[in-house]
């Protein structure tokens, strides 16, 4: 019975790690056909924001220029001009289909992530007792580490999150989140978030050192500053 109680939090931890993937996959598959059918039959207009409009227009202009260049190489004739018009028409339809699929992708992924967040929040609330046990284990593990190991771990974590090369990692992570939610890639927004998050984290971390570590373990702060210098 004691072993079973001891392993229960571990099973709960494993479920927290793997459950989001399973929920996301299942919800995505369940909603895919419904969202596709709803969008294709219930929407009479295509809604585009400024970024999507600009992207679609750029693709259309690029396509038109390529087809026009291809026709410039050939001899001019009525047949070629007709083929040029037909080619423009076909490729325009293809661009519209791609844009339609992108909109479905956005709605599907956004809905999936919202549902997953609600389910996992409820799962975490119901498993609050197990989370308390896991938290006590983590605190005990950290307490048993030496100050040198703690300082090294803090230094490694801060360098990864707010170090010199951290913007590249933030850019990849924020871009991945953008893609996961189905949003259109926006360099300006991503650059703004990349330049803001590390500064906020750095401020929070310095406050944490000043407010808590100096009181709990002054020797750890001394070792950390020595290693950081």
Curated annotation (Swiss-Prot):
Subcellular localization, as worded in the UniProt entry: Plastid, Chloroplast inner membrane
Stretch forming the signal peptide: none
Pfam families listed in its UniProt record: CemA (PF03040)
Catalytic activity from the UniProt record: K(+)(in) + H(+)(out) = K(+)(out) + H(+)(in)
Transmembrane segments: 7-27, 107-127, 189-209
Mitochondrion in keyword set: no
One cellular-component annotation, GO: chloroplast inner membrane
GO biological process, one term: potassium ion transport
Gene ablation phenotype (knockout): Enhanced induction of non-photochemical quenching (NPQ) leading to pale-green phenotype in developing leaves under continuous-light conditions.
GO terms assigned for molecular function: antiporter activity; proton transmembrane transporter activity
Topology in membrane: Multi-pass membrane protein
Keywords: Antiport, Chloroplast, Hydrogen ion transport, Ion transport, Membrane, Plastid, Plastid inner membrane, Potassium, Potassium transport, Transmembrane, Transmembrane helix, Transport
Reported function: Contributes to K(+)/H(+) antiport activity by supporting proton efflux to control proton extrusion and homeostasis in chloroplasts in a light-dependent manner to modulate photosynthesis. Prevents excessive induction of non-photochemical quenching (NPQ) under continuous-light conditions. Indirectly promotes efficient inorganic carbon uptake into chloroplasts.
Entry-linked HAMAP family: CemA_PxcA
Family of the protein in this entry: Belongs to the CemA family.
Name listed for the protein in its UniProt record: Potassium/proton antiporter CemA
Organism (species): Nicotiana tabacum
């Amino acid at each position: 019975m004691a072993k079973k109680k001891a392993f229960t939090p571990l099973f709960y931890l494993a479920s927290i790690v793997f459950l989001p993937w399973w929920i996301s996959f299942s919800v995505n598959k369940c909603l895919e056909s419904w969202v596709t059918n709803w969008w294709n039959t219930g929407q009479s207009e295509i809604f585009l924001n400024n970024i999507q409009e600009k992207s679609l227009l750029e693709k259309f202009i690029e396509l038109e220029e390529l087809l026009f260049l291809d026709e410039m190489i050939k001899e001019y004739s009525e047949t070629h001009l007709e083929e040029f018009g037909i080619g423009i028409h076909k490729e325009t339809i293809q661009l519209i289909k791609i844009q339609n699929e992108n909109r479905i992708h956005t709605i599907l992924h956004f809905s999936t992530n919202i549902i997953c967040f609600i389910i996992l929040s409820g799962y975490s609330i119901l498993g609050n007792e197990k989370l308390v046990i896991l938290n006590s284990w983590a605190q005990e593990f950290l307490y048993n580490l030496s100050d040198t190991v703690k300082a090294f771990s803090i230094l490694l974590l801060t360098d990864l999150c707010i170090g010199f090369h951290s913007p590249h990692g933030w850019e990849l992570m924020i871009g991945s989140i953008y893609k996961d939610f189905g949003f259109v890639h926006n360099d300006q927004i991503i650059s703004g978030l990349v330049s803001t998050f590390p500064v906020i984290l750095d401020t929070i971390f310095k406050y944490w050192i000043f407010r808590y570590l100096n009181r709990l373990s002054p020797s750890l702060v001394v070792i950390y500053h020595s290693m950081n210098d």
